[in-house]
């Protein structure tokens, strides 16, 4: 899976976290493991230009998705197994997202993770134009984000336990411990 991030926003953002959450969602949604995704972080002026050009709406927005192919959620059961493909581009505006995060009372990193999940779901054919679509997409978005955070917590616990076990085994003489 190839995920490219280009930060042109002028803001310091954890590209590793964006890649992590995008990779998690793509895997969880059973997208081909060789799929490609591009993410671009832009400033408010650039996002406002894109928003006007593609949506005919004034001002910046938080996230826009540009799929390479029109996909539908779930696909068809009788269709052949899809091969690797370019999913498309996600454009994020960290400065706009920062304002949203402040209003929501959570960190910018959380807002960007949420918007990344949202953008990937749009690339996979999900939409929220109708109430039922919104309910489905936002429910899935929140579940995926919650699952990603749980996955991160589990990985941190596992790493802490592995470090503790290595230290104990080193003290017991099973192998050289870093603190000996």
Swiss-Prot record:
Entry's cofactor comment: Binds 1 zinc ion.
Subcellular location: Cytoplasm
Keywords, sorted A to Z: Cytoplasm, Endonuclease, Hydrolase, Metal-binding, Nuclease, Ribosome biogenesis, rRNA processing, Zinc
Binding annotation for Zn(2+): 118, 122, 128
EC annotation from Swiss-Prot or TrEMBL: 3.1.-.-
Domain of life: Bacteria
Cofactor needs: Zn(2+)
The protein's name in its UniProt record: Endoribonuclease YbeY
Biological source species: Rhodococcus jostii (strain RHA1)
